[in-house]
Structure formats: structure tokens, C-alpha cells
């Protein structure tokens, strides 16, 4: 199991109160495969740096989770198939290096 960070930009036409429940449907892929979800952080509506699909705003969400590499790929695939998801990015956070004194 590896730690991952998922950033999602959701279509701004979606109601903000329905973002977390709809995101939870996708995150079930992680829990069903034995992974864990550490934190779900909904940033809300933000201005985009450039237009995506002719939209200048999006609803940002960041999810920290632990899963197998294949599970992360499957989650990314399922998110990309959804029309309300404008962009996704899954990264592995850098490990903190301990400095010996």
C-alpha cells in the first residue's frame, strides 16, 4: 500500500452540497480494495488558471488516501469517464526526510 494525493476539479454547474456524496461513490473503489481514505478536503469554487471545457471556474477537492497502485489507476480511469469531472491528478507525496543531528 502506498500513500497518494488526488486532486479533482469538478464542473462548477454541480451543486456544492452534492460534491462530497458523488465523490464518495468513486472513493468506494479504494475502500473495496482494502485501501483507506485519510482526508477529504473540499476547497469549493475557485477560478481556474485557464479555461477547461469553456469554463473559467471549478470546484476543487483534494483527497489523501492509501491504496495499491492498481487501485489508484482504476480510480483515475473511473473519474476520467465521468462528465462532471473536468480534471484529475493523482500524485504520491514525497516522503519526509529525517535529518540526523
Curated annotation (Swiss-Prot):
What Pfam families does the database record attribute to this sequence?
Ribosomal_S6 (PF01250)
Read off the NCBIfam families from this record.
Answer: S6 (TIGR00166)
Is the keyword Acyltransferase in the record? no
Q: What function is annotated for this protein?
A: Binds together with bS18 to 16S ribosomal RNA.
Name the GO terms of the biological process aspect. translation
The text of the family note is: Belongs to the bacterial ribosomal protein bS6 family.
Q: What is this protein called?
A: Small ribosomal subunit protein bS6
Q: Which HAMAP family match?
A: Ribosomal_bS6 (MF_00360)
Q: Which domain of life is it from?
A: Bacteria
- Keywords in UniProt for this one? Ribonucleoprotein, Ribosomal protein, RNA-binding, rRNA-binding
An example Gene Ontology CC term for this record: cytoplasm
GO terms for MF: small ribosomal subunit rRNA binding; structural constituent of ribosome
Q: Which organism is it from?
A: Arthrobacter sp. (strain FB24)
Record keywords: Lipid metabolism included? Answer: no
Cross-referenced InterPro entries: Ribosomal_bS6, Ribosomal_bS6_CS, Ribosomal_bS6_sf, Ribosomal_S6_plastid/chlpt, Transl_elong_EF1B/ribsomal_bS6
Amino acid at each position: 500500500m502506498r500513500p497518494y494525493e488526488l486532486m479533482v476539479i469538478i464542473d462548477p454547474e454541480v451543486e456544492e452540497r452534492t460534491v462530497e456524496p458523488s465523490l464518495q461513490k468513486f472513493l468506494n473503489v479504494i475502500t473495496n480494495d482494502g485501501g483507506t481514505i485519510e482526508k477529504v478536503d473540499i476547497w469549493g469554487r475557485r477560478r481556474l488558471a485557464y479555461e477547461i471545457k469553456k469554463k473559467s471556474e471549478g470546484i476543487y477537492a483534494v483527497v489523501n488516501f492509501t491504496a495499491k497502485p492498481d487501485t489508484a489507476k482504476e480510480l483515475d480511469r473511473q473519474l476520467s469517464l465521468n462528465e462532471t469531472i473536468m480534471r484529475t491528478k493523482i500524485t504520491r507525496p514525497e516522503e519526509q526526510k529525517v535529518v540526523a543531528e
